[in-house]
């Protein structure tokens, strides 16, 4: 519930910002909060979450583009270990499996905005400038609908490089 209220506060502030801003980048959708709640909370807690969410009048701006970075759990675990962020080291594999499945189901049916689904296992835009440039080009090409971005150099769509 803390995260839900925090997101609502952030969205309220976002709605108050300059209406003429050209670009706003966010690393979440409000719907993402519900995914985490469903995976994390037991049934009774999730029921309470749903009741509170239904009472909130959340006016989230519609995104121009949503980017879903998709990767297998093994790749996610490697990246978590490599980042070395303390609290992330305690994330359990089972939790990631459930969360990954929830994301896949959600984005399979998502129609709220243009959607770019990125095979994030095949690229490293943080450490590889060419990957960054190619991903940025794919983002700029994205106008509507749904696009699956899978770099051609990847023989196996979920291979590790």
Task: Annotate the PLM regions.
Residues 26, 65-67, 116-118:
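Hydrophobic/aromatic beta-strand patches that form the interior of the parallel beta-sheet core
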Residues 33-104:
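A glycine- and Lys/Arg-enriched "phosphate-lid" helix/loop adjacent to the NTP-binding pocket
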Residues 8-9, 54, 108, 123:
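Residue-level marker of positions within ordered structural domains that often coincide
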Residues 13-19, 57-62, 110:
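Conserved catalytic network of the ASCE P-loop NTPase/AAA+ motor domain
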Residues 29-31, 71-74, 120-125:
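Short, internal active-site loops enriched in acidic
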Residues 81-87, 95-161:
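NTP-dependent small-molecule kinase module
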């Amino acid at each position: 519930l803390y995260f839900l209220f925090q997101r609502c506060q952030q969205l309220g502030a976002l709605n108050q910002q300059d209406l003429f801003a050209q670009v706003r980048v966010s690393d979440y959708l409000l719907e993402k909060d519900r995914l985490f709640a469903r995976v994390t909370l037991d049934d009774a807690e999730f029921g309470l979450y749903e009741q509170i969410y239904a009472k909130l009048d959340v006016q989230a701006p519609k995104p121009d583009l949503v980017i879903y970075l998709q990767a297998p759990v093994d790749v996610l675990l490697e990246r978590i270990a490599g980042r070395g962020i303390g609290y992330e080291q305690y994330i359990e594999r089972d939790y990631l499996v459930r969360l990954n499945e929830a994301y896949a189901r959600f984005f399979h049916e998502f129609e709220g905005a243009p959607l770019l689904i990125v095979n994030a296992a095949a690229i490293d835009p943080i450490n590889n400038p060419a990957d960054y440039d190619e991903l940025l080009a794919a983002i700029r090409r994205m106008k509507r609908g749904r696009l699956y971005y899978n770099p051609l150099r990847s023989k196996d769509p979920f291979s590790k490089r």
